[in-house]
């Protein structure tokens, strides 16, 4: 073998000495692989390895998709919450408008309600006066009857 003439060639030759050797093909690029591409191997082992890699791929795919699904769920929840708050805001605005209208109507009716209260007080006073007048008229009627009975009764006794 020729000796390397450049420092890069020397480093490559030294690195090739550090690589583990394959029993059949010499130095390999992977220290973790015992699989020889051109060598016959156990088909059951190959099937199990393929199944393991497929299951691992499926597991990792689901593990990576789980946060994505969580974010999609959060997004849907946020959209639903936004819609609910929008509805609640509309309801609050409608309530505010209705309350303002009712307050305005109450303010417009307040003088009329005061007049109704005054009329009610006047009617109560008038009713009290009517009862007094009725009592007075009954008393007066009784006096008149007494006077008439005396006149009619006194005149009959004198005859």
Curated annotation (Swiss-Prot):
- Spell out the family assignment given in the record's similarity comment: Belongs to the BLOC1S2 family.
GO molecular function annotation: gamma-tubulin binding; protein homodimerization activity
UniProt-annotated stretches for the region Disordered = 1-37
* Free-text function comment from the UniProt entry: Component of the biogenesis of lysosome-related organelles complex-1 (BLOC-1) involved in pigment granule biogenesis.
Official protein name in the record:
Biogenesis of lysosome-related organelles complex 1 subunit 2
Coiled coil start-end: 69-134
Q: Where is the composition biased (Polar residues)?
A: 14-36
Q: Name one GO cellular component term.
A: gamma-tubulin complex
> Which Pfam families does the UniProt record give?
BLOC1_2
Phosphoprotein among keywords: no
The answer to keyword Coiled coil applying to this record is: yes
Q: Name one GO biological process term.
A: autophagosome-lysosome fusion
Tell me how this protein assembles.
Homodimer. Component of the biogenesis of lysosome-related organelles complex-1 (BLOC-1) composed of Blos1, Blos2, Blos3, Blos4, Dysb, Muted, Pldn and Snapin. Interacts with Snapin.
Q: Which UniProt keywords apply?
A: Coiled coil
